[in-house]
Amino acid sequence: MAKNIQAIRGMNDYLPGETAIWQRIEGTLKNVLGSYGYSEIRLPIVEQTPLFKRAIGEVTDVVEKEMYTFEDRNGDSLTLRPEGTAGCVRAGIEHGLLYNQEQRLWYIGPMFRHERPQKGRYRQFHQLGCEVFGLQGPDIDAELIMLTARWWRALGIFEHVTLELNSIGSLEARANYRDALVAFLEQHKEKLDEDCKRRMYTNPLRVLDSKNPEVQALLNDAPALGDYLDEESREHFAGLCKLLESAGIAYTVNQRLVRGLDYYNRTVFEWVTNSLGSQGTVCAGGRYDGLVEQLGGRATPAVGFAMGLERLVLLVQAVNPEFKADPVVDIYLVASGADTQSAAMALAERLRDELPGVKLMTNHGGGNFKKQFARADKWGARVAVVLGESEVANGTAVVKDLRSGEQTAVAQDSVAAHLRTLLG
């Protein structure tokens, strides 16, 4: 007997019971995006490897340790996308969407990182990302955060997430801060773990993000990034904070929030939660005003964020059990008798024409009434439409409300109107 082939570790199947809740959550997210005027862009999952090295940074964990990179038959180095921003910027440059234009874009799909699988963190994971190009003021940063807050309210999780903000300033301000931070870390090198020692010279701001408690205690005495900000970045950040306060969105300034990718500047933010056991990031982003030019385009201001859908689904299920998947079926068409199946299928097609958007399933595979009604219950149907030989003969159907048990004989021409009333 042949050995079963299993899914790759950290790359999961999502079965029908799971995808139903995903679809409802994704539908909620997309409705909010539409209400803000954002447009979908669809991007390849494979890009040239240099795109990510230039965008994310050669000495980041993503590029050094986590990318799925391979050589194709032409000898080109290709990578499964570890994030979406770089590909979105590449597409914008390639298709002339960015220079002197305003774009509000979103995308959704799988990303890939070779890291240790754990709850809410997988090697193939799904993100929804938003990217805005051509706007440089703090008002668009605030709009993106307000958009995410509207998501949390719609999903019933607003009380379970907290907004953390920071400004990491301009490239020049970060260079000055980097020098001061490295000088401080060199004085306390014996207190650093091996990972922080490695990062100290390659990407010292990432030391601020260390999860080591001893390093975090040391950093209490380190220079503060906020003391090195340029005046424009200070004004930008103050403007953002004022807009959020006016919108009633609470936030915490976290001066150690730097994000893990090199392309950010000025605003960075994260929505975090403690409702999944340990603190976890649900959604994160910031400004990346230099990335378009860095990837070969004309200088264009930009800001965006990405949200991990696996972690969002876990959070919704943990704190809002009333947020359930929509039923697979609204109406189940029961047919019994030797000559009723073709009539039942014809009636089903007519009802689909007259009731667009309603989910109707026709019984197949035979079975008596008891078995067919059991199938209707299994699929979550609210209403059954019943056709027997006598109903076919006299042009009627029985419509049964499966919640109340009430049933009515209705002329087939009137079934759609009757169902419309029952389903509301």
From Swiss-Prot:
Tell me which Pfam families the record gives.
HGTP_anticodon, tRNA-synt_His
* GO terms of biological process kind: histidyl-tRNA aminoacylation
Record field: catalytic activity: tRNA(His) + L-histidine + ATP = L-histidyl-tRNA(His) + AMP + diphosphate + H(+)
A molecular function GO annotation: histidine-tRNA ligase activity
By its UniProt entry, which InterPro entries does this protein fall under? aa-tRNA-synth_II (IPR006195), aa-tRNA-synth_II/BPL/LPL (IPR045864), Anticodon-bd (IPR004154), Anticodon-bd_dom_sf (IPR036621), His-tRNA-ligase (IPR015807), HisRS-like_core (IPR041715), HisRS/HisZ (IPR004516), HisRS_anticodon (IPR033656)
Please state what class of enzyme this protein is.
ligase
Q: Which GO terms describe its cellular component?
A: cytoplasm
Q: Which PANTHER family does UniProt cross-reference here?
A: HISTIDINE--TRNA LIGASE, MITOCHONDRIAL-RELATED, HISTIDYL-TRNA SYNTHETASE
Q: What is the similarity comment for this entry?
A: Belongs to the class-II aminoacyl-tRNA synthetase family.
Protein name in the entry: Histidine--tRNA ligase
Q: What is the lineage of its organism?
A: Bacteria, Pseudomonadati, Pseudomonadota, Gammaproteobacteria, Enterobacterales
